[in-house]
Amino acid sequence: MSTVEVNNLIKKYGSFEAVKKISFEIDQGEIFGLIGPNGAGKTTTLRVISTLLQINSGSVKILDYDLKTQPDKIRKIISYLPEDAGAYKTLTGRAYLTFIAKFFNEKNTVEMIEKGIKIADLGTRIDDKVDTYSKGMKRRLLVGRALMTEPKLAILDEPTSGLDVINAQEIRKIIKNIAAKGTTILLSSHNMLEVEYLCDKIALIDMGIIIEKGKPKDLLNKYKSNNIEEVFTKVVK
């Protein structure tokens, strides 16, 4: 059974159609990338799937729960990390994870916190205040927060955006490890080079339309290209 099923999804802001009848499926444990330039409709799609935006037409199902009629059920099994997510700067990393954990599971709070600490992998800095963290450290803390709840589906908007090479590499390793344990990952990225390493399948989106989708290697072969950037350019033309 697919974890995510999106069929003919349309999302409008007033008269502007941001997402235009897109469809895709994601299997359990897959890392699926929604890839495209800024303004292509990636974040809107992720916000719809995370139940933050209502759809105008089409359907979305998460593990057979319908987005329109069962959003509360969906919220219990997903985790969403927006690109511009922040953390409480006056708290330590540990205190921040503790604060979040209490919203999810009062009985197993300690276990959940330890899981978040392990994922973030900040060492002794976990007990320092968040406002002393670098951007990469903050992002690792936030990824730990998103994944410590053991969601069935983790939705990550531009998880490595703005990070240096080392921190981006660390985030990619975290995502790979979590997916290997059975969590399904839906992420967005405008970095078309990293998705060849990270994603099992991708969908290329431009101006609200999915213009191509499949396994990165299959797309490279189909379009006789060296990388996904070349594929995207050829498809758009």
Predicted segments with their positions:
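Catalytic Walker B motif of ABC-type/P-loop ATPase nucleotide-binding domains
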Residues: 154-158
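Conserved ABC transporter NBD signature motif
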Residues: 58-66, 73-74
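Helical segment within the ABC ATPase nucleotide-binding domain
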Residues: 169-181
